[in-house]
Design a protein with these regions (language model features):
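Conserved mixed alpha/beta catalytic, RNA-binding, or beta-rich assembly cores of soluble enzyme
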Residues: 1-134
Length: 134
């Protein structure tokens, strides 16, 4: 057998096994589109986005719940503008859906410690992020 990563197949197996709350990390934007089409309730987290194209960033913004920015210019510019919430500034994580926004805010509420919450036009930039963005 091979050790290939097939995220849509993994989500299909999870639902077929009786799981009703399924989350998946994806690195290929096409997987986000495929999974969202087949399983609208799946929670999709896009990772490893450095170097993706503008079109791929748009696919993630339209189909993933959370998009990590890594060192991606396209994610910051495209997903960042469409995001409902941005967590972090050096390596932003963008909540693209209401359930992603709620998840991040619930994590903040349940965590001890201090947080800065401010309103801003997204994406909000930091002087400490990776350079260059690709």
């Amino acid at each position: 057998e091979t050790a290939d990563m097939d995220q849509p197949r993994g989500v299909r197996v999870a639902y077929a096994s009786g799981y009703s709350r399924v989350a998946v990390t994806i690195a290929a934007p096409e997987d986000a589109v495929s999974i969202r089409r087949m399983f609208p309730d799946a929670f999709i987290i896009a990772v490893h986005t450095t170097g993706i194209t503008d079109q791929e960033a748009l696919m993630l913004a339209d189909h993933a719940d959370i998009v990590t920015s890594c060192a991606s210019r396209a994610v910051r510019e495209i997903a960042g503008r469409k995001a409902l919430l941005q967590a972090g500034s050096s390596i932003p994580v963008f909540a693209m859906t209401r359930k992603a926004k709620d998840l991040i805010l619930d994590k903040v509420k349940s965590t001890d410690g201090q947080f800065l919450v401010t309103g801003a036009k997204l994406p909000s930039e930091s002087d400490f992020g990776p350079q260059p963005l690709v």
